[in-house]
């Protein structure tokens, strides 16, 4: 099977890219390991920020449904769910595994929107049942309707940690505290205000010291941190919890990009190793594009815009649309992307993308 574009990852970036490419005449295949398209959106019950034409005030699960319905209704898109991309080969093919077996699929271009994985912390007892990543807790509650426990310690005060803490309380689960290693809260003030109104304490310059329990989590010890993020002896506090939820960040998933020979670089502001790519989301390997968290950890709103830019660029590269039209539409999308990244909490992300931009310019001489 050969397609003009193969999209790996059926989350917000991948689906947006697939739609934009297909709407401009490209034959697309979308591959996702999950049975349901939507990626992280399927478990995001909170409302998005931004402006109305970019889903402001719409819940993530509804955005995911809209994208999924649009993709399934597009005749130029073939969807492979429950299918995992196992490897990239030099003949521009992917080895994929589906319920029907293992096969190869070939593409003229590729969009890798493979997302990210949660970062874990090292501490005594971190392998006990009851220690979860925040994404796993969201999946349990918002997809399967299962409460993870009765009492939670949240580690990390970024948007995910704050939002999941609020959702836990809505589900009737006690959140004993949110601990944050940094001297300030990492997420939006609106989310922090919501959890504080529920009486959940947010302790900055604190972290978990250890988890307690023999067969599962039965408690945790937290302590204060000094300016070098070292625990301060004598500041320990024991907390009665049966769940420890780690919302300590994400790191991009780039396995297939490494296999494809894409040039990668370490950018801490973007979460780790990311591909080097230009303003069209194309990597230094011609015909290989990237979008979403695989290109750098960011919000779903910006991931969708980056996916659209990539899909539009694929259509232009394959000669489906004239260059002048591509540049006009790309510039509009780029302006919207810049506006979404203009807030103070996006300063770290902007620094990361400036690093990527400088690398690209330097290599082009």
PLM feature spans:
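Residues forming the flavin
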Residues: 1-365
């Amino acid at each position: 099977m050969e397609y003009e574009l193969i999209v790996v990852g059926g989350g917000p970036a991948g689906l947006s890219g697939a739609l934009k490419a297909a709407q401009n005449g490209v034959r697309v295949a979308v591959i996702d390991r999950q049975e349901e398209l939507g990626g992280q959106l399927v478990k995001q019950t909170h409302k998005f920020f931004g402006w109305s034409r970019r889903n402001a005030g719409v819940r993530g699960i509804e955005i995911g449904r809209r994208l999924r319905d649009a993709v399934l209704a597009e005749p130029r898109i073939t969807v492979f769910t429950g299918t995992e991309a196992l490897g990239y080969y030099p003949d521009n093919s992917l080895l994929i595994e589906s319920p029907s077996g293992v096969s190869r699929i070939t593409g003229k271009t590729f969009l890798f929107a493979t997302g990210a994985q949660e970062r874990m912390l090292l501490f005594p007892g971190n392998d006990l049942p009851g220690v979860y990543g925040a994404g796993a807790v969201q999946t349990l509650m918002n997809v399967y309707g299962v409460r993870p426990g009765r009492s939670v310690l949240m580690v990390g005060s970024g948007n995910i940690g704050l939002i999941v803490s609020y959702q836990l309380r809505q589900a009737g689960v006690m959140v004993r505290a949110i601990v944050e290693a940094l001297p300030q809260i990492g997420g939006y003030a609106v989310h922090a205000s919501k959890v504080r109104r529920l009486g959940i304490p947010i302790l900055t310059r604190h972290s978990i010291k250890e988890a307690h329990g023999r067969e599962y989590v039965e408690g945790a010890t937290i302590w204060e941190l000094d300016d070098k993020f070292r625990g301060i002896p004598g500041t320990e506090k024991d907390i009665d919890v049966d769940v420890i939820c780690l919302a300590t960040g994400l790191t991009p998933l780039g396995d297939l990009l490494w296999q494809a020979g894409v040039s990668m670089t370490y950018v801490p502001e973007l979460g780790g190793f990311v591909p080097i790519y230009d303003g069209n989301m194309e990597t230094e390997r011609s015909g290989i594009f990237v979008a979403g968290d695989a290109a750098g950890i960011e919000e779903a709103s910006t991931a969708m815009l980056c996916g659209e830019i990539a899909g539009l660029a694929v259509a232009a590269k394959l000669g489906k649309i004239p260059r002048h039209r591509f540049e006009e539409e790309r510039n509009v999308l780029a302006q919207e992307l810049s506006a979404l990244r203009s807030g103070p909490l996006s300063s770290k992300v902007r620094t990361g993308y400036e690093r990527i931009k400088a690398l690209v310019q330097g290599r082009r001489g």
